[in-house]
Amino acid sequence: MWARKALSTWLSLILLGLASSRAAYGQSVLEYHGSPGRSGSFVVPYLTWERARGIHREVAFQPQFSGHLYAQPLFWQPAEMLIVATEDDTVYAIDVSSGNEIWKRVLGRPVPLSTQPCGNIDPLGITGTPVIAEGTQAIYLDAMVEEASGPHHKIFALSLRDGSPLPGWPVDVADALAARGQLFDSVVQNQRGALTVLAGRVYVPYGGHAGDCGDYHGWVVGVGLRNPQDIVSWSTRGQGGGIWAPGGIAADGRSLFFATGNTIGVSTWSDGEAVFRLAPDLRRETRSQDFFAPSDWPTLDAQDADLGGTNPLPLDVPFSRGTAALVLALGKDAHAYLLDRDHLGGIGGSLASKIVSTGSIHTAPATFTVGEDVFVAFQGRGADCPVPSPDNALTVLQISIGTSPSLATVWCGAFQGAGSPIVTTTDGHSNPIVWILGAEGDDRLHGYRGDTGEPLFAGGGPRDTMPGLRHFQDLLATRDRLYIGADDRLYAFSF
């Protein structure tokens, strides 16, 4: 089961693929963590271990915008621009080199916290990381918009050229689902997970607000990239079960993977505390190969110990007879679960499980390889750190097969904050560096050798601090810079 800036310039860049007169900034970063699989792995040829020691913040790079920023910025290489979507319901295109604004698009009025039934984002606008579809040359995102009738979740498709909405967009989620006989209450639903694209549709995950108020459910809504009337959906049977992890939905080219949080007031399993695999049509399946939930899901529900705190991470792990197609799930219950990607296992059917942290895990993991070995980095205090320290807040696991799948902690890193890690290598394997932000902690960038955990960059000097980082925030890697989004501005680090 395992194996297996002007318009002419714009058109020239897109259609003819002409080289820019400025330095190339590497491949586009179209979605969260750089790939549908949410690997968080970036190839940066010149970022060796030695050069990482001299990385520094470019104080002259000071693009500014309006709004709190929870979503990861994106990078569109043909026009050499960064895309930033903020809680002010505004999307900006920013020149990757100068930091100058190329265009901006205001999508509506965000929703103030004072009018929300619960929550912790004020105001609430665009939270989940958008996705870029190369085929339509558009950015897709969900925005919470305040109107006379109340708050509305709207899915937008914006032209990369100037930010204008494509014909037929936006889609009002509640209205679109009501036309299909389904109830979606925008007041109690929140959208913070990253979007993805698969098989001609954009997929948007929904959960509830912080505080679990109201009759919300976990939802996935798919909308045709070229036909916004083409809508498919899936929702949890029980109340709750939100899909709220910052990584949102992962995809492996065939299927969608996501994790749900705690359900509320259920006596039988009703889709909470689970990892799901769905086909692009989002058809509900009840086969054990299409979902996994820990056997103690009632306890997790009662303790609000969501399995849905991180996105599932597809992994391909070499072993003696080929390659194992796995999924790693990490939970607020501090467990890691290894699953067979082709047969998730139903209730209690993991291949391996282990307590890997001394506290909750609820950011996005990243994966990388060293030789034939597969590693996963996550923000959390490791339960089995080789060198114990009260400051350890980054943990790296090795995933092995052997006679059976297993997980082991190989190193831990000390820093203060709650960012999500990424990994850079120079060629896909060499010079692995795990980068993480001290978001809502020391507000600094930290880098570690991926193979040993040796600190390479420990935050720098006074000019390298980054006020305004929001929890769960991660980095964006291009050819010669690392970019970080924060409230009202972007930061860039050069090497």
Can you describe what each PLM-predicted range is?
Residues 1-5:
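N-terminal secretory signal peptides that target proteins for export/translocation
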Residues 8-19:
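Bacterial N-terminal signal peptides
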Residues 21-26:
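Sec/Tat signal peptide C-region and signal peptidase I cleavage site
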Residues 27-319, 324-346, 360-385, 392-397, ...:
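Mobile, glycine-rich extracellular loop/lid and propeptide segments
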Residues 351-353, 390-425:
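A beta-strand-loop signature enriched in Asp, Gly, Thr, and Trp
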Residues 352-356, 381-386, 408-414, 462-466:
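Short, contiguous acidic/charged loop-to-helix segments that flank catalytic cores in large enzymes
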